[in-house]
Amino acid sequence: MFAARITSPKKIEIEDIETPTIKEGQCLIKLERWSVCGSDIRHAYGPVMPEEEYPMRHGGACHECAGTIVESKSDKFKVGQRVIVLPSQDGPGGLVEYYPGDESRMALVPDHGDLGEWILCQPSGTVLYSCQQMGTILGKDVVVMGQGSIGLSFTAIVARAGARRVIAVDPLDYRLEWGKKFGATHTINPDRDNVDEALAEITDGKLADIS
């Protein structure tokens, strides 16, 4: 199978390696969609960490991936089902053709819809967990700093959880426009406006309940 591998700083090569075999409690997943986490962008554009060793493991760095089960040794999943899988640290990363997924690190997604959209459930799950730690959001004013993928997930979830006002803050106008589509009631561009003053005006002086 094909697998991507970071062989030296900022260099990714495609290698042909053996397709993995699976153990009990695992499924072999033919991966079809991948998403690049912000924490992985640095491998192409950011600093090189001194503790990193090359070549890195096959499939790294990628931990947001989804596909269809082609072989199963799990009582919980069957061939043909579509899943999101979270790669573990003791196996390959997600930039591979086939991945041996542990059933405890897999989640079913519906048969309908594009996997490229369903895969966003993976980072959004982190956001959902964070929102659960906040307690009730109902009727509160919530400020979301940044409207990248994680920020937009926060905007969408708190808007649907009953927040009174969802205030998106980002220096990029196109991201603020997406914030509105995802549920922001107000937007602030910190390059143009003083954030504290804008918040005070929006919230009648009380600022935010949650930020």
Regions flagged by a language model, labelled:
Residues 39-45:
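Cytochrome P450 core scaffold surrounding the K-helix E-X-X-R motif
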Residues 4-12:
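Extracellular beta-rich ligand/substrate-recognition surface
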Residues 2, 26-28, 141:
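Residues that mark the start of a beta-strand
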Residues 2, 15, 81, 96-97:
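Extracytoplasmic/periplasmic beta-strand context in beta-sandwich domains
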Residues 117-192, 197, 210:
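Mid-domain Rossmann-like dinucleotide-binding core that forms the NAD(H)/NADP(H) cofactor-binding site
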Residues 63-64, 83-145:
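NAD(P)H dinucleotide-binding glycine-rich loop of Rossmann-like/cofactor-binding domains
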Residues 20-35, 48-89, 112:
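Glycine-rich beta-strand-centered segment in the early N-terminal region that forms part
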